[in-house]
């Protein structure tokens, strides 16, 4: 497996990954291309045999950063890929001068919540009815560098 930075040239592959991971809420190829072209929007992806099997992206707004997306193909989960992607994304955020990270996750997504908690994120709130298809609350998480458990 290979971990590398994502570029706008990866937008089509990431759109396919989005569709597999987030049916009904997937980012389009055009949205991904725009995001990957924007300044201070790092993204990392994991490839296995040339196939993109996971990615993480966000936006740095120093001194803070927001994790936008973390996606791993269902058949590739529970192999440490999410952990590797999040670690790489956090390093890129830190390189932009960020030391406080935020994210939202579906309240029912126990595996993702466990991943974020393992990485030192703390639940700090709830956004009611944040998600659609299906409608669901978002759990808000925060991590401050130097304060990890």
Where are these regions (language model features)?
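Extreme N-terminal starter segment of soluble prokaryotic enzymes
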Residues: 1-3
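Acetyl-CoA-dependent GNAT
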Residues: 5-75, 83-96, 144-148
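Glycine-rich, flexible loop/turn motifs
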Residues: 23, 126-127
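Enrichment for repetitive, rod-forming helical segments
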Residues: 25, 66, 76, 113, ...
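C-terminal "cap" of GNAT-fold acetyltransferases
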Residues: 43-44, 99-102, 106-113, 119, ...
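Conserved beta-strand segments that form the floor/walls of ligand-binding pockets within enzyme
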Residues: 45, 66, 71, 80, ...
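Conserved glycine-rich acetyl-CoA-binding loop
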Residues: 51, 73-87, 94-96, 100-101, ...
């Amino acid at each position: 497996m290979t971990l590398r930075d994502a570029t706008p040239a990866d937008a089509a592959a990431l759109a396919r990954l989005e569709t597999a991971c987030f049916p009904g809420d997937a980012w389009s190829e055009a949205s991904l291309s725009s995001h990957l072209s924007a300044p201070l929007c790092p993204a990392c992806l994991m490839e296995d045999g040339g196939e993109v099997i996971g990615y993480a992206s966000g936006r740095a707004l120093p001194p803070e950063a927001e994790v936008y997306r973390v996606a791993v193909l269902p058949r590739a989960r529970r192999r440490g890929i999410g952990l590797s992607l999040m670690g790489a994304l956090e390093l890129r955020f830190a390189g932009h001068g960020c030391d406080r990270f935020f994210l939202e996750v579906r309240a029912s997504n126990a595996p993702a919540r466990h991943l974020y908690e393992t990485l030192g994120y703390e639940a700090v709130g709830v956004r009611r009815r944040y998600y659609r298809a299906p409608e669901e609350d978002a759990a808000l998480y925060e991590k401050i560098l130097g304060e990890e458990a």
